[in-house]
């Protein structure tokens, strides 16, 4: 084999050609003389056996076409020296014969290439078994219920626990009765009387124990049924929270009810004051002039203004003066003809609620105020006070002209009109 052929074939190999071959690339390949049939076949067979594996790239070996053996020996299509191979620029090592123009074109092609992005692969929930999913959901619900019930433990007792005072629970829980130790039973929202509430009455606790109820029977039924129907299948903490919220929403501002008169109060202190003043029969503050007793010192101070002659509250419509601002407010209802309180029996309307209640005793015949001396009963407390002066002989109303005293104010007015000619 001539030396010139080996040199030309070596130069024509892709290892020694630039990345951007010139226009005479195919021309040089065509000028290579083809060997004879017998000689060429032997040479090609020998070269195919002797060709080292290092001269072929890994990509070219993997992407080798199946019909390469059937291709013509002079064809470069699909071979390593094919200039249009898509793997040419990735595996070919740099050559010192690369021109600057070709380097610029190569850099431009790399700059224009799209950035490499990682493919997003969503997590397949189907990979988990059904039991695993149920376990995760149940664990989350239990954690949520515990977090929500943790804040309620500051306000709502859920059962008799060691180390807690018995006064925080109802009487059944404190005495170990039927309601003791029941989980989910709120000592605040329950219908039973709390020991702490009864402790507010002091000496009047035994007498006022039957007058205390929280909440009312109807309202308690509402919130209990509501809580059990909506939250029966939930945890204890959520149930306690729902019952407490339902109690606040349904009962509103007033949730402490007096059983005797059905009056509702928003705080236990208000109920305690009401029981002490109205139903306990004990009024420790007495007026020195008329002997009238009161449950609070503030009420006594307001009452003392009745005995004074000063009238500092004047009506701007008729000019009438009053000793109390509350009396003036009641008087102004007369000028406006506002009677918002009707009688449920006869329909007669009144300015004040107290006047309406006094009027209803006429229809019912009820006389709740009884004299302790003679046993006579009255429908109004004012009539009982006036009657008690007959037994004591006390005459708080005296004439400033003659000094004569009277038990009732109306008797003094009549005396001034008839005896002294004053109106």
Swiss-Prot record:
Disruption phenotype: Null mice exhibit neutropenia, characterized by absence of neutrophils. This results in growth retardation, susceptibility to bacterial infection and early lethality. Immature granulocytes and macrophage precursors accumulate in bone marrow. Mice have inner ear anomalies, as they are ataxic, circle, display head tilting behavior and do not respond to noise. In the inner ear, hair cells are disorganized in both vestibule and cochlea. Outer hair cells of the cochlea are initially improperly innervated, and just before birth, mice lose all cochlear hair cells due to apoptosis. Ubiquitinated. SMART domains: ZnF_C2H2. Changing residue 11 to A: Abolishes most of the nuclear localization and reduces transcriptional repressor activity. Changing residue 3 to A: Partial loss of transcription repression. No change in nuclear location. InterPro entries: C2H2-ZF_Transcription_Reg, Znf_C2H2_sf, Znf_C2H2_type. Residues 48-57 have a biased composition (Basic and acidic residues). The modification Phosphoserine is found at residues 20, 57. It comes from the Eukaryota. Its main location: nucleus. GO terms for cellular component: nucleoplasm; transcription repressor complex. Residues 1-20 are annotated as: SNAG domain. Residues 141-258 are annotated as: Required for interaction with RELA. Residues 1-76 are annotated as: Disordered. Induction: By IL2 and CSF3. Induced by the endotoxin bacterial lipopolysaccharide (LPS) in primary bone marrow macrophages (BMDMs). It holds the Pfam family zf-C2H2. Interacts (via the zinc-finger domain) with ARIH2; the interaction prevents GFI1 ubiquitination and proteasomal degradation. Forms a complex with EHMT2 and HDAC1 to promote 'Lys-9' dimethylation of H3 (H3K9Me2) and repress expression of target genes. Interacts directly with EHMT2. Interacts with RUNX1T1; the interaction represses HDAC-mediated transcriptional activity. Interacts (via the C-terminal zinc fingers) with ZBTB17; the interaction results in the recruitment of GFI1 to the CDKN1A/p21 and CDKNIB promoters and repression of transcription. Interacts with U2AF1L4. This is Zinc finger protein Gfi-1. It comes from Mus musculus.
């Amino acid at each position: 084999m001539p030396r010139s052929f080996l040199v030309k074939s070596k130069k024509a190999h892709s290892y020694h050609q630039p990345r951007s071959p010139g226009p005479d690339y195919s021309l040089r390949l065509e000028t290579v003389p083809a060997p004879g049939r017998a000689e060429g076949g032997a040479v090609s067979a020998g070269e195919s056996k002797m060709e080292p594996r290092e001269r072929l790239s890994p990509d070219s070996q993997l992407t080798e076409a199946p019909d390469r053996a059937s291709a013509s020996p002079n064809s470069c299509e699909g071979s390593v020296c094919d200039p249009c191979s898509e793997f040419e620029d990735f595996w070919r090592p740099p050559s010192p014969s690369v021109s600057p123009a070709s380097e610029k074109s190569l850099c431009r092609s790399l700059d224009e290439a799209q950035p490499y992005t990682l493919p997003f692969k969503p997590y397949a929930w189907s990979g988990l078994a059904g039991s695993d999913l149920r376990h995760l959901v149940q664990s989350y619900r239990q954690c949520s219920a515990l977090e929500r019930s943790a804040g309620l433990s500051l306000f709502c007792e859920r059962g008799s626990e060691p180390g807690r005072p018995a006064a925080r629970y109802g009487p059944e829980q404190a005495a170990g009765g039927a309601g003791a130790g029941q989980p989910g039973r709120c000592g605040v929202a329950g219908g039973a009387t709390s020991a702490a509430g009864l402790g507010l009455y002091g000496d009047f606790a035994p007498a006022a124990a039957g007058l205390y109820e929280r909440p009312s029977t109807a309202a308690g039924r509402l919130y209990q049924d509501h809580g059990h129907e909506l939250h029966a299948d939930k945890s204890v903490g959520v149930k306690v929270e729902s019952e407490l919220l339902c109690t606040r929403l349904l009962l509103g501002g007033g949730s402490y009810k007096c059983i005797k008169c059905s009056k509702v109060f928003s705080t236990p202190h208000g109920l305690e004051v009401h029981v002490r003043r109205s139903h306990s029969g004990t009024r420790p503050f007495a007026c020195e002039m008329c002997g009238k007793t009161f449950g609070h010192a503030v009420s006594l101070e307001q009452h003392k203004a009745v005995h004074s002659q000063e009238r500092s509250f004047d009506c701007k419509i008729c000019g009438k003066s009053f000793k109390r601002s509350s009396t003036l407010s009641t008087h102004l209802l007369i000028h406006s003809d506002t009677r918002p309180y009707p009688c449920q029996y006869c329909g007669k309307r009144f300015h004040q609620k107290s006047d309406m209640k006094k009027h209803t005793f006429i229809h019912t015949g009820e006389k709740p105020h009884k004299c302790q001396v003679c046993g006579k009963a009255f429908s109004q407390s004012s009539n009982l006070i006036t009657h008690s002066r007959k037994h004591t002989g006390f005459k708080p109303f005296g004439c400033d002209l003659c000094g004569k005293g009277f038990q009732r104010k109306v008797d003094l007015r009549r005396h001034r009109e008839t005896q002294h000619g004053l109106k």
